[in-house]
Amino acid sequence: VDLQGQGPAAVIAGPPRSGRSSALVTAARSLLDRGTPVLVVTPRRSPLRDLAGAPGVLAVLDGNARSVTGGGADDFGGLPGALDPLALVAGHERYVVAVDDAELISPDSALGLALDEILRTGRDGEHGLLVAGATGDLATAYRGFAAEARKGRTGLLLNVQSPADGDLFAVRLPRGAVGGPPGRGLLVVSGTATPIQAAVPD
């Protein structure tokens, strides 16, 4: 998915164990391999936390904007030890923020508002946002960064459970889209769906 062309955001959605975190790790590693810095946000345990300390990874934050590796002297949003995502990306024109389990981040929290600002400025900048989460929860998000990310109608819909899952991207799903093994789903680009099998990281 071209975040510059279809972005500045893409959504990876599916039920638990559908491969959405693996797809997000694969996307993050692909970006890092191309020299694009990545800021990772993971409110709960996620394979993305393994990227901490990797070259090009600006930081790996939890749902309270604290580094998962410890440290950090800021008090972002009034939380001791929390880091300001906007400060972490400052000085980088090109970067991507990868957020796993996005539905767990309140749109009204300091972190949620910072992610919203990153998405808003990405429309005219060279940075983007990759958001992963549960299909149902993301489909019912009506404000904040997750709702704004959906508006581009671009991303992955993994392990489709029902035709209503297409509501996330405001698309009608093709027949036979329901079911399949983990990683099976639809690539949706600007509202057009194509069947895919997501790659898994090495």
What are these regions (language model features)?
Residues Y95, A132-G133, A139-D202:
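Phosphate-binding and hydrolysis-coupling loops of NTP-dependent motor/remodeling domains
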